[in-house]
């Protein structure tokens, strides 16, 4: 008679974050057992679970933000970038995002169907862009400009997946300070991603000045390779016309702040986001200088426009009025910064078309916000069907927090813990 089989030791949740880090294998086993079970979008998610999930999103995008900032500076110094530290940071963040999207797709926690589809479309676009970018390098040689189609796919995919994360958190987090802080963090990453293409000119204008002064930080092989590709130093460091930087800053980045201000709802949302972003860039500037990497110009004019955005939304000004005021003040602030310091090349004649275009975009946003589509967007889509009392992933009674109904933003979505496989 064979000896009785000993039962497998129970896998318990770590008692603290320190214990979780001390025993990572046990942590993974516990997470896999309790949370990697099939479920539909809208699955019951407690407040604590929601905070942990979206904290992981914040960490992932923090890695991507630091990596991308360093990567731009890296490409103004070195030609080689295989296994470069900024690429490794960015890749670590991307790997975390892939894991999170797989988790949401399989388990259904913390997202509705629309948020999940945005996350999936975003990471899919990003991953498809990687081989396209590699092929672009093989066919066209050196391509460090952030304005190339393959690079545009990368930050477009990032924007789409961030939109999904913003939606998921805003739908299911209970109103309060935690909801506002995490939302501000996600919107900060969205703003940084929107501003990312403009960094080429912001690094390039200083690198070109150093080159002309005979003090370039770029290695000779980088400049030689650029010349072999038929590019002059000016074309290499400032690859787009001088109307592009102001047009993108106003029509894309300020519009991002308008949407963030409307969604988050705090009075100084746009100002806080712009100031935090500029503070981050200032710290990065100092660290890059210490490390011998090229620094960049800071787009301080963004802060002036952000203040006007907050005031215009608070005063309930029509979009065409707010757009003219915010765009005009941004151009005036840029002119002052140009007189006192340095900015990338701006075509000042573009002020009229850019400000008018921004006013039209803001007015269109006002109209969209009043539409039936916008009203339907605020409600969760295709939640998991209710099936009795809420339970967690292993059938225990779930710690369901109180909150608004599932049809309202901020709902925690109380549904059955175990959902059928999709």
Predicted regions and their residues:
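Aromatic-anchored segments of alpha-helical transmembrane domains
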Residues: 63-68, 124-134, 188-199, 273-286, ...
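Hydrophobic cores of alpha-helical transmembrane segments in multi-pass inner/ER membrane proteins
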Residues: 88-105, 153-169, 244-258, 299-312, ...
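Membrane-interfacial loop-to-transmembrane alpha-helix junctions, especially the N-terminal start
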Residues: 49-62, 109-125, 175-187, 263-274, ...
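Generic multipass alpha-helical transmembrane bundles of integral membrane proteins
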Residues: 150-158, 162-296
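Short, highly charged, low-complexity non-transmembrane loops/tails of multi-pass membrane proteins
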Residues: 372-404, 408-421
């Amino acid at each position: 008679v064979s000896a009785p089989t000993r039962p497998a030791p129970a896998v318990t949740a770590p008692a603290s974050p320190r214990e979780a880090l001390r025993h990572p294998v046990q942590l993974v086993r516990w997470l896999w057992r309790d949370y990697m079970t099939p479920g539909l979008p809208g699955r019951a998610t407690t407040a604590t679970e929601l905070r942990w999930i979206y904290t992981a999103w914040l960490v992932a995008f923090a890695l991507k933000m630091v990596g991308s900032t360093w990567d731009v500076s890296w490409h103004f110094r070195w030609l080689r970038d295989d296994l470069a530290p900024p690429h490794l940071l960015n890749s670590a963040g991307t790997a975390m995002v892939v894991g999170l999207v797989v988790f949401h797709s399989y388990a259904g926690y913390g997202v509705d169907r629309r948020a999940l589809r945005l996350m999936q479309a975003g990471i899919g676009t990003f991953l498809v862009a990687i081989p396209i970018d590699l092929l672009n390098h093989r066919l066209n040689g050196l391509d460090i400009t952030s304005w190339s189609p393959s690079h545009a796919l990368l930050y477009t995919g990032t924007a789409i997946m961030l939109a999904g994360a913003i939606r998921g958190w805003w739908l299911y987090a209970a109103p309060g300070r935690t909801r506002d802080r995490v939302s501000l963090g996600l919107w900060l990453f969205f703003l940084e991603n929107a501003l990312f293409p403009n960094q080429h000119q912001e690094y390039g204008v200083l690198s070109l000045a150093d080159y002309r002064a005979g003090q370039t930080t770029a290695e000779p092989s980088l400049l030689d390779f650029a010349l072999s590709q038929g590019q002059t130093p000016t074309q290499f460091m400032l690859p787009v016309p001088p109307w592009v930087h102001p047009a993108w800053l106003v029509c894309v980045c300020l519009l991002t702040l308008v949407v963030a201000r409307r969604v988050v709802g705090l009075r100084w949302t746009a100002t806080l986001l712009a100031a935090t972003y500029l503070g981050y860039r200032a710290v990065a500037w100092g660290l890059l200088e210490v490390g011998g990497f090229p620094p960049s110009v800071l787009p301080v004019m963004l802060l002036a426009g952000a203040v006007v955005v907050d005031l215009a939304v608070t005063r309930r000004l029509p979009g065409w009025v707010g757009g003219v005021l915010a765009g005009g003040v941004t151009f005036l602030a840029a002119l002052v910064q140009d007189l006192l310091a340095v900015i990338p090349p701006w075509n000042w004649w573009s002020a009229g078309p850019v400000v008018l275009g921004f006013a039209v975009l803001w007015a269109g946003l006002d109209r969209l916000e009043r539409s039936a589509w916008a009203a339907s967007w605020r409600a969760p889509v295709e939640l998991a069907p209710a099936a009795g009392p809420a339970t967690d992933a292993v059938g225990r009674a779930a710690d369901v927090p109180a909150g608004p109904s599932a049809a309202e933003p901020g709902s925690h979505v109380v549904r059955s813990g175990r959902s059928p496989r999709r």
